[in-house]
């Protein structure tokens, strides 16, 4: 079972996440576990599309991450993803270049915290 206090301590809005999950803590936990299961592949995609300078695909990944992060209450990461998605739409490579590394770091830190809260750290 998720430790809600740990999630909140690290900035997740668990009330918002639960709202998106019909106020069902078990469903919320399933959403977080699915989010974690997809994280390695999503990071790989973001890194690949960034290196290839494929802004369309990078923007699609950012859009998806924006929504899934919001659904679990990860507002800060969701907002960062929104900014990158918008930068892709505007072909603002300078903004993408300045934000990409921090965005990936932020995402990795969040997944580490989620693993800790879910008791998946060893």
Model-derived regions, located:
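Two-component system phosphorelay core
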Residues: 1-122
């Amino acid at each position: 079972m998720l430790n809600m206090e740990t999630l909140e301590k690290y900035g997740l809005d668990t009330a918002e996440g639960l709202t998106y999950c019909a106020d069902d803590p078990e469903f919320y936990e399933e959403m977080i576990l699915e989010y974690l299961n997809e994280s390695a592949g999503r990071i790989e995609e973001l890194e690949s599309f960034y290196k290839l300078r494929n802004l369309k695909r990078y923007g699609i990944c950012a859009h998806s991450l924006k929504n899934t992060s919001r659904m679990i209450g990860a507002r800060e990461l969701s907002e960062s993803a929104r900014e990158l998605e918008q930068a892709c739409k505007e072909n603002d490579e300078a903004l993408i270049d300045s934000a990409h590394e921090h965005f990936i770091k932020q995402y990795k830190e969040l997944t580490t915290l989620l693993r800790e809260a879910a008791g998946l750290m060893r």
